[in-house]
A protein has these predicted regions:
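A short acidic, helix-capping loop that chelates divalent metal ions and anchors anionic groups
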Residues: 40-42, 73-78, 113-117, 123, ...
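N-terminal substrate-binding region of glycoside hydrolase catalytic domains
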Residues: 25, 29-46, 69-72
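Glycine-rich, proline-tolerant flexible connector loops at the mouths of alpha/beta enzymes
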Residues: 35-58, 108-115
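Active-site acidic/histidine proton-transfer and metal-coordination neighborhood
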Residues: 18-21, 57-60, 78-178, 188, ...
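Conserved beta-strand positions in the central sheet of alpha/beta enzyme cores
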Residues: 35, 67-69, 105, 152, ...
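Histidine-acidic metal/acid-base catalytic patches
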Residues: 1-6, 11-30, 138, 146, ...
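N-terminal small/glycine-rich loop or linker at the start of catalytic domains
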Residues: 1-10, 66-76, 112-120
Length: 287
């Protein structure tokens, strides 16, 4: 099964492009989908109709939109801010439902790249952090259940649900929560990536094609081109195929040193190369 390949429009350059430019470039390269994000749709200032129009323009160019990507940090001691962030996610669900987008991507927080984020165990207790994340995601998932939109938790590095075991704990706490399966983050925690994909076969709503190398607690981890990291691609792809995954797989490009040093911060050629590598990995895995 060859899953349609999309592109997460959230790299350091393309996120600053006008959507029409991203649509044109990705369509010309041969991508089949785009994951739009909170960058292209501001759920504070825009109505769900604005996102529906963006999705319509995307589909007019022959591309689908499998996911709306959000990144609201649910780990905060500010009760007003926490409520605001949960409501942001609920508005994103409403926008996805109106546009016919099947999933919304979320993470728990705290975000490791944000120096202002709380540090669990220092600024906030582990118990408090889990209670906030579970309560917030429960509200969002319950709201989404009535709309047909699935919520896909991404196990982002540094976040509360950053490893296989911690993600499973969150899934146990929020039974209808799905997974946006990004294998790169499980490289950093040393998890058995194909095994977790199999365990979550009924919870995976979307897949990211992204490689990783290094250890989470080190400053030296990075996300290289597909095939250059430690993701066991053949095992992972055959596991997904054998377990019947039938959604989209979106490339998430974060090879920022390569982008800067070799391509003058133009993501077009790295995107083209990533698409070629993804198709090669598909072929080698026989999917």
């Amino acid at each position: 099964m060859k899953w349609p390949i999309g592109y997460v429009a959230l790299d350091s350059v393309m996120e600053g492009w006008a959507p029409e430019r991203a649509i044109g470039v990705l369509a010309d390269l041969g991508f089949q989908a785009i994951d739009w994000s909170f960058v292209q749709f501001d759920r504070l200032d825009q109505s769900p109709t604005a996102f529906r129009d963006l999705v319509s323009r995307t589909r007019d160019a022959g591309l689908q939109v499998p996911q709306l990507v959000m990144a609201d940090d649910l780990i905060t001691l500010d009760a007003h801010l926490w409520t605001q962030r949960v409501n942001h996610l609920i508005r994103a669900v409403d926008a996805a439902a109106e546009a016919g987008v099947p999933s919304v991507g979320v993470s728990t927080g705290p975000h490791g790249w944000d120096r202002t984020a709380l540090q669990v165990g220092i600024d906030i207790s582990e118990t408090q952090a889990w209670d906030l994340a579970v309560a917030g995601l429960t509200q969002v998932v319950e709201h989404a259940d009535s709309s047909g939109v699935r919520i896909g938790l991404e196990s982002v590095w540094g976040s509360l649900a950053r490893s296989g075991e911690r993600t499973q704990r969150m899934l146990d706490s929020v039974p209808d929560l799905g997974i946006t399966f990004d294998p790169s983050h499980f490289v950093l925690t040393g998890d058995d990536i194909p095994q977790w994909a199999h365990v979550w076969k009924d919870r995976i709503v979307h897949v990211h094609l992204k490689d990783g190398f290094g250890v989470q607690d080190s400053e030296d981890f990075f996300f290289p081109l597909l095939g250059e990291g430690r993701v066991p691609w053949q095992q992972l792809l055959t596991t997904l195929a054998d377990d019947g995954y039938d959604g989209y797989a979106s490339i998430e490009a974060e090879s920022y040193a390569l982008l800067s040093q070799c391509f003058d911060n133009d993501p077009t050629e790295p995107a083209r190369l990533s698409l070629q590598l993804a198709n090669r990995l598909y072929a080698l895995a026989g999917v």
